Amino acid sequence: MHCTITEHFIRHYPEKLNYSGNSDKDELGNGIIIKIRLKELPKGDRKAIFEIPDALKIETGVYHFPEDFNALDLFRKREYYNVYADESGDSPYIEAEIMLHQEYGEEKVRNMLLGLPLNLYNAAESEVYLLYDGARFAWIANGEIVNINFPFGSLKAENGDIYISDSAEIGICRNIKSLESEEKTETKNESIAFYSARGYNTWGGDIVNFYHDGVYHFLVLLDRHHHGNRFGCGAHSTYHMTTRDFIHWENYGEIYPIQNSWESFGTGTMFFWNGKYYYSHGFHTDRVIPRDKVGSRLLEKNYEREGFFSAVTYDELKENGLYPSGANYMVSDDGIHFVQGKKQIHCSENPSIYKDENGGLVMYAGYGAAGVWKAPDIDGPWKKEDTDMPVFDNSSPVRNSSECPSIFEWNGYKYIIMGFRGYWQSGFNDNDFKDLAVVGDDIYDGLCVPMVANCGGRYILAGWVGGSGWAFITLHRELVQHEGGRLGIRWMPELTPNPDELDKIAEVKKVASGEELKLDGKTSYYLECRVKPQKNGRVGLAVSGSGKPFVFELNTERQKVQTLETDNINSFTEEVKALYEYIPEMPEKRTSCAQIPSENIHTNSHDFAIANVRELKDEYTLKIIFHYEKKSDNLVMDAEIGAGRTFVSNRPDFKVGNIKFLTKNAEITDLKLCKMGE
């Protein structure tokens, strides 16, 4: 299986600009590019190499791992300096910090940081460039933006001279409008499985998927620093991928790059309506702008007066001193090149819009609003049809959020998936929805905020793996439907490894309890075997290596699958509760997900259990990928059980070295272990 991903990216040419050794500090607000070439990599403590007093500072130094890791603040941990430490644990760095003056908020001046690991981008061998243009604060290396944050506020240089160290060659350019760039492409032999966008610290967050005219569209919130950008407010844009066969993919990059300091995308849906493609999305503007200054306030007043929502143009919002927020949309003729509608149509910040049976549109309003809304046109009028579904927060026994509703119908049954935990199914050809998450009969498997697309009769689910903070790598699944509409979930055949095409390193006809296999922690592996359990059978894989060991267990009697850290790899661990089993322990008065009395739930994608795994009752095939994620230097274990359930566990700070098989009243046969490569 030869998988490819063709990535579109922007190549910048800062080397063509003219640089000098000084700058007018009063023109900082217009932007600046700083060229830096170190005379040698730093070897000691933190040292300033450039400073504009009270505005911008650039420093270099060396972090020593693992000693320094716990002392780092959260943002620096998410720069992944430790991943690029050398054999002695040293990770030289360069960090830039700007001082932003803000109109809103309690803190009138806030410092924003952005760094680079110099073992990855050696600024002593070639120049790196620091860009600030008001909306972007970025490092450029080899012509690409390789790290970025998004400022909110402005720079104001105070009195004092600019400092330039003699340990680096530094040039300054204020003419950032002359920065040339062009679109380039690169094709990689890579699968979409475990994908996380181009860049050493880029991750995929909430997703949108859609299928039309033989093309599958995959839209993902582009993340750096696990929601840490713009002081923890995210500042996400959306990248867009397509495929016709799920094997060969094209990543077109950002649909719309962040251009204003208030912009941060929330997902909605993509749909084809009246001959055009639409991407409905949210703007989380009030993360940085006071609520009385965002467009939703005007739309709410209009709704109170008129009883419906209608579109308000960005120009009208600006005339009222307001910023766009809530639900917005983009439109395209070809499904690839989108332009802004430049209208706010609703207050929902996760507007899931679909075509309805009458040719109009229906919105399942997520985050910022609630209920089901219908309109004859994208611009409205949007009238509320239903206030009961989907439920969230205080109304939900599992405390699911209202994020990213995904609605689909299959053979007369309707389904709603919402946020990290919400899951409902209707009866046959009716709208009598039952909450299946409260009985543990959902399809959550460690993927976060999943959405589903009907791909010509195949129902494809996608989401991101939790456990590393907000956003990480993304995965695809295929749903299977059973009697009564019950759903199962499996790997996509197109993305499932074929052991005959891989390097087999072990084949065992019958696996004895206690038998072990050795693995290399910086390599990915595929394991496949048959399991024949008795009614009270248990099978476990005790996984050890670099970091805390854990046991992956499949319990036929309890019909549960779980992972749990352990100090004893010679035995099964204690039972882990599935999410629904915590409901009786939660307070009667519902408030938030913080009431769940354990971190060992599927929303954290680490140690958790899934229930009602009916595939365990009979003989089944177990498939596991031990994926080594280079960008975070850790293991992600992904399993398919009996072609009907899946389970993904992220193991931060862990690399596999050994697998010990545990069996009780069960047999493991026909095992194959294959190397998939680094």
Where are these regions (language model features)?
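Glycine-rich, compositionally biased intrinsically disordered regions
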Residues: F50-I52
